[in-house]
Design a protein with these regions (language model features):
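Phosphate-backbone binding interfaces of nucleic-acid-interacting proteins
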Residues: 1-106
Length: 106
């Protein structure tokens, strides 16, 4: 288990998907360009089996904004998209109401 202090270090922010495309080297991954208000980030997400890239453009998502960059199959990811999954289903985590890009999720 993590402590509340450790959890408070995680920076969750609302982002708006500006672009989405299939990862060139991975069947399960999408490469997203996400507006976080003060900057745009590239995020690689394992949601390709559940979402068409075009359906994500313009939608709001919740991302971990202070995660160290990682390279996934040759493409840098500058954050992590949050999603819920159960019994093979997957749903991207979104704010319940429209929020500005970069809004803090608490």
């Amino acid at each position: 288990m993590i402590t509340i202090e450790q959890f408070q270090q995680v920076e969750l922010r609302v982002g708006i998907v500006k672009e989405a495309a299939a990862h060139p080297k991975a069947d399960r991954l999408l490469v997203l360009k996400v507006d976080l208000g003060t900057e745009e980030r590239q995020i690689v997400a394992g949601i390709r089996a559940h979402y068409d890239p075009e359906s994500l453009v313009g939608t709001q998502v919740v991302v971990v904004a202070n995660l160290a960059p990682a390279t996934l199959r040759g493409v840098e990811s500058q954050g992590m998209l949050l999603a819920a999954s159960s019994e093979g289903a997957l749903a991207v985590v979104r704010p319940a109401a429209p929020m500005p890009a970069g809004a803090v999720v608490r």
